[in-house]
Amino acid sequence: DKPVIGIINTYSDFNSCHGNLNGLVEASKAGVLAAGALPLSFPTISLHESFSFPTSMYLRNLMAMDTEEMMKALPLDACILIGGCDKTVPAQIMGALSANIPFVQLVTGPMSVGSFKGDRVGACTDCRRIWADYRSDNLTDEDVLEASNQLVPTVGTCGVMGTASTMALMVETLGLMVPGGACAPAVSAQRVRIAEESGTLAVKIANLNNNPRDWLTERSFENALRVLLAVGGSTNGIIHLTAMAGRVGINLSLD
């Protein structure tokens, strides 16, 4: 019998962070088929930070429940979790760990950077600076329109070391995605190749019944915290790593 590999599709027209997701689903399916298994995609809710503030943490937990229950309900041998926006990746990891089914995380990747008045700019860090300049009458309405077109020039997650990029690095550090899978841009051939590799890896872990709950340890999360400090990542990473560790019975503290 061929392994059944589930592929979680979190695409939404409202979610530009996941604008390339349907293509990644198809690339993942190609990797699964090439490895001799059956890929079947299914949806869960899609969270976009811009539209879920200030309740996005609550919605993270709701998405974790959605992910867990769908993975438990379906006849899966392994699963590919595809997402990217801030709360999505920790929600998917939390749900998958509780479902206790082998999985691979695939992130959508960061958007390209823009240029405004000769400076490299990226959402969401520069939008706050530019808005402050506008409110101080240092920028015109036309300037703000130009900046808006440059802050989000492509699909993908925020092109700064915010929560999305931070969590992608943390998950790669934990060994839950294809090596090198955290940073490739959303609009790159490398992102598509990573999706195909994720499909192949999902089949491999299904055949081995390689479940992260069996090998994630306190040292694993301590290592992720070290990387968090090394890259100057988002402080939200601490909150999400703590929640993820709790799903495998690890009490992660600042001590």
Sequence positions of predicted segments:
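Flexible, glycine-rich loop/tail regions that form catalytic "lids" or insertion modules at the edges
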Residues: 225-227
